[in-house]
């Protein structure tokens, strides 16, 4: 069971999660994020320290310490546990203050950011123990490992975690942190933000769990973005590939990396709502409902790049040179469309956009369109199921479409549009595919 920051965002929420993790009466492994807002505040501390602004860094640390001291009084009933937690927090925040006196690098930043999850898991395990639950904290730094490329190392994780579990049998609840780890050199490191979903999936696979549960503040994956479209509905079941597409193209409830380990191990993933724990949520497994469109998602901040080949370089290796340019800057391509004279691509990582464009100019005329958005329709879109692509394109007939990607996946058809047209596109797709008209959404 994995719980995100909003799920443990207050002492009351921590108590609710504690009840959830013990209600099935079976041994449970729990992955926790930092309490909501904490990681952002720790990143703020690191930013100040990079700028050598120790006074501002200390102000944030002091405010954070006061907030957590208040949480202790609300979360714990006995003086024994309150004293224990106050002592722990004093040591934690004293540790954070040591970074205001030393040379500061990305290594120190990772240690600072890691403390949010260390605090939340320590508070949770002590709360469980105070209420009589046999619980233990297994620090992620003892078993979560990444390789030299910064990717999780499943074999090393499984070996270390199995050894830890064998040394600590018989507990009702095992807890760990979500995105902190050690790299290939044994140094404290962090997975990308949102990586706690990935951690939960890797742990579930390592332990051969019956099910991996991701708990958030929404009732499963919805068939459209509820921030833009009213009266969306939770999708009760998704195939692993459908869930991957939705997560990659903008469904914030699930991190894209979470799905693949579970898919290969054949372990179902269930998305649940901590605010409404009895709601059905979304089940992700290997079952595919034939001939059905499941959901719509959108990905913002997309840049489209078009390269029109010059006659001189209009050779068979034109595409190879274009793709090698993106590979050289470790920039992934989301969508691609080719013609006899050129190629169009989209990216969302613009950290090397200027360099990429400059290099692409060697191979042809380059056009860049920013402030674009990818809208995707997900479901059983196998080529044998005719008509669904027409349904999607008909819904967007009044919206300028820059690119269409179809056929690279049996589960997704994607449209590149302007960001300003996003809401209209999502509403129209809901009306056409799911029968939710705009006047019903008001």
For the regions a language model picked out, list residue spans one by one.
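Nucleotide/pyrophosphate-binding catalytic subdomain
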Residues: 1-254, 259, 418, 441-442
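Structural motif
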Residues: 27-30, 111, 134-136, 172-175, ...
């Amino acid at each position: 069971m994995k719980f995100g920051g909003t799920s443990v965002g207050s002492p009351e929420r921590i108590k609710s999660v504690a009840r959830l993790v013990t209600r099935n009466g079976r041994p449970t492994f729990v992955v926790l994020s930092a309490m909501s807002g904490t990681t952002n505040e720790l990143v703020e501390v690191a930013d100040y320290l990079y700028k050598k602004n120790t006074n501002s860094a200390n102000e944030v640390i002091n405010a954070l310490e006061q907030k957590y001291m208040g949480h202790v009084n609300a979360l714990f009933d006995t003086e024994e546990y309150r004293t224990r937690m106050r002592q722990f927090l004093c040591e934690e925040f004293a540790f954070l203050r040591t970074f205001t006196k030393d040379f500061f690098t990305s290594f120190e930043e990772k240690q600072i950011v890691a403390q949010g999850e260390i605090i939340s898991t320590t508070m949770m395990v002590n709360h469980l123990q105070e209420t009589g639950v046999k619980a233990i904290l297994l620090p992620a730094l003892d078993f979560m490992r990444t390789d030299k490329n910064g990717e999780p190392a499943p074999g090393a994780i499984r070996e270390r975690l199995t050894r830890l579990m064998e040394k600590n049998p018989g507990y009702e609840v095992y807890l760990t942190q979500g995105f902190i780890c050690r790299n290939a050199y044994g140094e404290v490191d962090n997975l990308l933000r949102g990586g706690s979903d990935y951690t939960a999936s890797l742990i579930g696979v390592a332990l051969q769990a019956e099910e991996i549960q991701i708990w958030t503040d929404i009732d499963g994956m919805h068939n459209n973005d509820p921030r833009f479209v009213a009266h969306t509905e939770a999708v009760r079941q998704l195939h692993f590939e459908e869930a991957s597409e939705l997560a990659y193209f903008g469904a914030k409830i699930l991190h894209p990396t979470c799905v693949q380990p579970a898919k290969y191990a054949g372990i179902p993933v269930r998305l649940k709502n901590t605010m409404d724990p009895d709601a059905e949520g979304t089940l992700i497994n290997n079952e595919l409902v034939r001939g059905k469109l499941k959901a719509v998602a959108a990905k913002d901040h997309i840049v489209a790049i078009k390269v029109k080949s010059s006659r001189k370089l209009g050779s068979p290796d034109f595409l190879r040179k274009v793709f090698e340019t993106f590979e050289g800057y470790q920039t992934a391509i989301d969508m691609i469309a080719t013609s006899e004279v050129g190629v169009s691509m989209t990216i969302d990582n613009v950290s090397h956009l200027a360099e990429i464009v400059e290099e692409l100019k060697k191979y042809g005329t380059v056009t860049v369109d920013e402030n674009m958005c990818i809208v995707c329709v997900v479901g059983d879109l196998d080529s044998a199921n005719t008509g669904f692509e027409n349904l999607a394109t008909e819904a967007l007939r009044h919206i300028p479409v820059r690119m269409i990607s179809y056929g690279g996946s049996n589960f997704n058809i994607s449209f590149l549009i302007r960001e300003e047209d996003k809401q209209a596109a999502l509403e129209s797709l809901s009306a056409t595919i799911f029968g939710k008209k705009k006047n019903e959404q008001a």
